[in-house]
Amino acid sequence: MTYRTDQATDLDTTRVGDTTTVSGWVSRRRDHGGVAFVDLRDATGLVQVVADPEEIQIVDELRMEYCIKVTGVVQERPEGTVNHEMLTGEIEIHANEVVILSPSKPLPFMLDDRSEIEERIRLRYRYLDLRRPHMAANLQARSRLTGAIRRTLDELGFLEVETPTLIRSTPEGARDMLVPSRLRQGNFYALPQSPQLFKQLLMIGGVERYFQIARCYRDEDFRSDRQLEFTQLDLEGSFWTQEDVLVTVEAVLKAAAREIRDVDLTDPFPRLTWQEAMDRFGSDKPDIRFGMEIVVLDDLFEDTEFGVFSGALDGGGTIRGINVGSRELSRAQADGLVDRAKELGAKGLVWIQVSEDGSLRSPVAKFLSDDEQSGLISRLEASLGDVLLIAADRWKTVSQVLGGLRLDLGRPNTQDELAFLWVTGFPMFEEEDDGTRTFSHHPFTSPVSIDEMVSDPDRAISQAYDAVLNGVELGSGSIRIHDPAVQRQVFEVLGIDEETAERRFGWFLEALEYGTPPHGGFAFGIDRLAMVLQGEDSIRDVIPFPKTQTGVDPMTEAPAEVDETQLKELGIQIRAEVIAAREEAGE
Amino acid sequence: MTYRTDQATDLDTTRVGDTTTVSGWVSRRRDHGGVAFVDLRDATGLVQVVADPEEIQIVDELRMEYCIKVTGVVQERPEGTVNHEMLTGEIEIHANEVVILSPSKPLPFMLDDRSEIEERIRLRYRYLDLRRPHMAANLQARSRLTGAIRRTLDELGFLEVETPTLIRSTPEGARDMLVPSRLRQGNFYALPQSPQLFKQLLMIGGVERYFQIARCYRDEDFRSDRQLEFTQLDLEGSFWTQEDVLVTVEAVLKAAAREIRDVDLTDPFPRLTWQEAMDRFGSDKPDIRFGMEIVVLDDLFEDTEFGVFSGALDGGGTIRGINVGSRELSRAQADGLVDRAKELGAKGLVWIQVSEDGSLRSPVAKFLSDDEQSGLISRLEASLGDVLLIAADRWKTVSQVLGGLRLDLGRPNTQDELAFLWVTGFPMFEEEDDGTRTFSHHPFTSPVSIDEMVSDPDRAISQAYDAVLNGVELGSGSIRIHDPAVQRQVFEVLGIDEETAERRFGWFLEALEYGTPPHGGFAFGIDRLAMVLQGEDSIRDVIPFPKTQTGVDPMTEAPAEVDETQLKELGIQIRAEVIAAREEAGE
């Protein structure tokens, strides 16, 4: 039994006259002049099969997506029927035998790229969705992407090491997913949010250059671009400075862009400190494919009579603006911008348009002096028709508002251009909503200065850095703490008392005591990188079998109920209130 | 700040006179003639540092495994002190500066390969254990092994596709590990025992050639070579016959052996049917590095007067023997063999030694006729001193007993030779201890003949096959069922009624309805392959961070108790009896 002698796209005019056997799916079928033309699709592409239903009766049974085997002779297509858009468009197979390997029920949706199908239906029939050309291309690209990453790191002398996924719960900013233990009832493993501590242990273990393409887990409330499980490239090196990390990650990202986009990126990538990124782009993950940079206007308005501006300055705030270019701005559109600014946290927004006659059209124009008006035009390099947006508030709010409006109004809607950059010098700590201090990156990140961290923690800068692509945070890394005394100090600044630190991290603090090398590393999301490189809007389109935003697989209906006996073996039970709620819902 | 200009083994006599900076660990330190000799170890190996403590006082502080940075000049070693067993044995670094990067506490055990350390202690300090040369070599080998596997499959046009690890519970012969869902309280994900159904879905999705190095999970009661989580190479192809699978896996295993052992294996590998393997070696995973094959003796004893033999034959059993070669056999040793046979399930064991004078020494010799005695010698090709072991019982018991004794007495105690083979033609079903019928491989395996499967299921042969290396089952595979009607028939033979099949597998049976290609595949354990190739006795020595046999990580003490609030969010609680037992134990 042979299913095939050739793949579809192996066939071309050099093979004319050869007998061939191909297997694949019926992608299209037309009848013309008593003869059937079947586009047979396999993993490589399409080839046209010509069959006479009078000779081969089974051809009349063929329907869309039937899986078939065809034996026949390769022939040149008759003049005028050559299809130049098809790789095999110069030939066709004249069938001698057609075998139906598997029939197909009528399809729930068409398998071309043009159909817009509800995502839940696509996921319910993911195995059909994956036959669509752009989804098949996404799977292929992802495989090539991880291949290129591995080759690059292999050449750089990295070891791929598998770290455990049934670990002890560690606090990394999101909820752990738990796995009850059967042999130690009442105890739980956690699924890793990242291999962070294990890769640091590998450094202590003398590995020096580690990487892993690792499955990680975060039980966050779903946002559009999050999944319960995701994949990250995780890497770490010993005797490394920040420069070593950045150069290595650049080599990996260059290889990725070359493999998937066939472009050679210029290195080193642009670098911005976190402060610069916030000041110029109002974001710690700026999209630098376009300008509209934020301009400081404080000095221009230091004597202003316009109360909103003077009030902001008096309150220790700042006045900043962006020029969003020449565009139509109806009153309704202007109101829309103000509403959006409020959504982003502003109390209001000043909009100004440079009219045809050079005067400023704005509800606040009358409050601004001539000097202020001309200063605005020159500072924001405004031309006729340009729209200027100005916010006055605390620095954080102004940055957030102008950064958000900048993206709304300027962001390209394709991913054709690739703009990578580094953001460095992140603050060591940040404030939680409840006012408590927490780590910005994770609690194993090294401060730039230990003294500064202790004396003025809220202004302390860490040795952490992010890689950003087209406004998407690809990943982050840092130089780690390798001195157990410093690690204890960081816990202290975070308000973790000694006893708690010992209970939760004692084993790790002990490991640091045995000649830990200085080390640092990085991790970035494969899903997000693949998404941008493939020009997709959703990570779900580059994940073979994703979950919905509520963590459900519509195909298998996971998660599901399980037998009570299984739970009993694990020493757990479902809480009474959950069962009651389920019964009430009539399940 | 530069930690190093060179790795230890970059340095040789061509570098004499160069100033170099190296970083690593103090592997050994001797003092001789007022000068300190420090073996500095990094990931590449060792280099000797010479320092004068009078000039560089810090040298006196150096202890084992301190992490240090040394700057100095490369010099040839004085005549008579060259060390030919060391890659850098012709040179040494004369230190100008030594910096302690991290001190180390005194070690809990010596880091050489000679020390025998209790495994629990090794795992408690795994980060130190990994610094030992053979453990470092195991990590490196494993990375090279998966690299070679990936390169091979990449060249063969396979896509690496990541399948989900939070799935719906499926029955594959072992217990699932469960993950409670927070967004759907009272529901659970399962961790996959293998990517089986998802890889079949990829075939339905048109991928045609898939592989993945996949983390899998089995909550089995621990045996010496099992872990809760393990890694397998998982592959699948469409339009494939058994031959296609075997050729592909052979290519992968050949690449693995070449990479790790630098040997070129002859292909195709030997193939035995399951029946042959059981008959000749008494095992479905025979170690064929040595003979001692099982010989059928039924016809020799068809008229025997020895009751044990005639009784076995009359009861439908069989008489078989092995020649375990010339060896000392005291009465106590012989009794030991009989005891071992009983452990293996025999009621007794006949032992015979060919004495110096050619007569047979055996408690049963007197019951055997001259013809039977000479027949035994000729059938078992016995020479002077040879020990013959004979079992008479049901076929299954005889195979088990002689197969077990054969391994005890013949198995080489190194893994120097690599003997791969295929076992094919496994039975479709087998009997569970309680007499019910279950699948031998998994319920998605195709029978050789559907008619036979329905008419005589207990004798039906499947299209399943195992790869065996030196008596270790590396993995198994099969041609799958691609016809939903056949899949339903298999469920029926397994006693799974239609409603249950629909409830548990309805989504998969539906997927099979959409033009499923014929397909088959394979999976083998990376841990076991790495173990044999590295000549280790335990898979734990090739897993970076394994668990103990009770599923515990002695380093982090996972699994651990978690906060009640975390459990509440997940809608679960620990059962009262578990809490009571814990309190009783005084925890």
Where are these regions (language model features)?
Chain A
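Class II aminoacyl-tRNA synthetase catalytic cores and aaRS-like
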Residues: 1-587
